[in-house]
Design a protein with these regions (language model features):
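Divalent metal-coordination and catalytic microenvironments
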Residues: 18, 28, 54, 66, ...
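Active-site-proximal cofactor/substrate-binding loop regions of enzyme domains
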Residues: 65, 74, 86-117, 138-139
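Active-site metal-binding motif and surrounding structural segment of the metallo-beta-lactamase
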Residues: 33-75
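Active-site metal-binding loops of divalent metal-dependent hydrolases
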Residues: 29-30, 55, 79, 111, ...
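Metallo-beta-lactamase
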Residues: 24, 101, 111-227
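Active-site neighborhood of phospho(di)ester-bond hydrolases with catalytic His/Asp-centered motifs
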Residues: 26-27, 47-56, 74-79, 106-109, ...
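Cytosolic catalytic domains that perform sulfur/thiol-centered chemistry
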Residues: 157, 170-172, 186-334
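Conserved beta-strand hairpin/beta-sheet module of binuclear metal-dependent hydrolase folds
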Residues: 1-46, 117-119, 124-134, 140
């Protein structure tokens, strides 16, 4: 059985491809999906399944485009209210292709529709190989419980406790844990930089899995929650509907200085992606600097939101292309 993690450092986001006997599934794909198409072609896989562990809030997923380009079925928690054709996941549902067997667990708490995926290699069927936990269980942390507009953080934290203690922590200690995010993500507070773990290690080291009562857990998880970025709710709705294909986005053209000034004066944001030192030396008056290093797209979304017209400033066309792609990953397209 084939298993591969794809880690997008700039968003601290992990996605996965599982394959066997010519068929593959992709779990929690990033918006630009070429990486999965190329990997599938390299191994002779047909991508037949796209699985979302939940409606992501911190990035725009590629599930809709990947399904459109491959004919794959999209699997998503039944409570997501998705507005595109999909297979609704219920607790205990199973999917098998080749030697790869998937069992779905409904694990609400981070979001109401969250699911985890237990992966078993049928050539070694005595114990599951891994569990893909989405944003329910991280390495060293658990998902924040404040992303639902219909439920309180206390209600979600209680559900998260039940999902962890009644389902995920019942798995054998040797089962590998692969989450959807690592350190730097805004979906948790104390995530490790490690990209995988085991159920046993998390039981022993994860602060949120200390042997607390349900009441103590809820109090711990809801105390001093960091502010929820404003764009999170917008990304959830984009993912609920399915993002427009990146291939349909218009090409960018270079603008003369007078046009840049005119657009700025009309309300556009001039976003300077150069380093702070280069920006400090010379920049367009009124422009905002968010450098490409680090969490560029997340910071841009926090500072600017998703609905303003953006004029990009960068050293060269390659940097412009990078800046634009990274912005589209969080839903900034204008």
């Amino acid at each position: 059985m084939y298993f591969e993690q794809f880690y997008l450092t700039c968003l601290s986001h992990a996605s996965y491809m599982l394959g066997s006997e010519g068929t593959a599934a992709v779990v929690d794909p990033q918006r630009d999906v070429e990486i999965y198409l190329e990997e599938a072609a390299k191994h002779g896989f047909s991508i037949d399944y796209v699985i979302e562990t939940h409606l992501h809030a911190d990035f725009v997923s590629g599930h809709h485009e990947l399904a459109a380009r491959t004919g794959a079925k999209i699997y998503l928690g039944a409570k997501a209210g998705a507005k595109f054709p999909h297979v609704p996941i219920h607790d205990g549902d199973q999917l098998t292709f080749g030697k790869c067997h998937l069992k779905f667990l409904e694990t609400p708490g981070h979001t109401i529709e969250s699911v985890s995926v237990v992966v078993t290699d049928l050539e070694k069927p005595s114990c599951p190989l891994a569990v893909l936990t989405g944003d329910t269980l991280f390495i060293g942390d658990v998902g924040r419980p404040d992303l639902s507009g219909d439920m309180t953080p206390q209600q979600l934290a209680g559900m998260l406790y039940d999902s962890l203690h009644r389902k995920l922590l019942k798995l054998p200690d040797e089962v590998l844990v692969f989450p959807a995010h690592g350190a730097g993500s805004l979906c948790g507070r104390q995530m490790s930089s490690e990209r995988s773990s085991t159920i046993g290690k998390e039981k022993a080291t994860n602060y949120a899995l200390r042997p607390n009562s349900r009441t103590e857990f809820v109090k711990l998880l809801t105390a001093e929650l960091p502010e929820r970025p404003g764009y999170f709710a917008l990304d959830v709705e984009i993912n609920r509907s399915g993002a427009s294909p990146l291939q349909e986005m218009p090409l960018l053209s270079a603008l003369p200085p007078k046009e840049v000034m005119a657009r700025r004066d009309a309300g556009a944001i001039v976003l300077d992606t150069r380093s702070a030192s280069d920006f400090g030396a010379v920049h367009i008056p009124g422009s905002i600097q968010v450098g490409l290093a680090g969490q560029y797209a997340s910071w841009a979304a926090i500072v600017l939101g998703l609905d303003k017209e953006i004029v990009l400033v960068a050293e060269d066309r390659q940097k412009v292309a990078e800046a634009r792609m990274r912005l589209t990953r969080v839903g900034i397209e204008k």
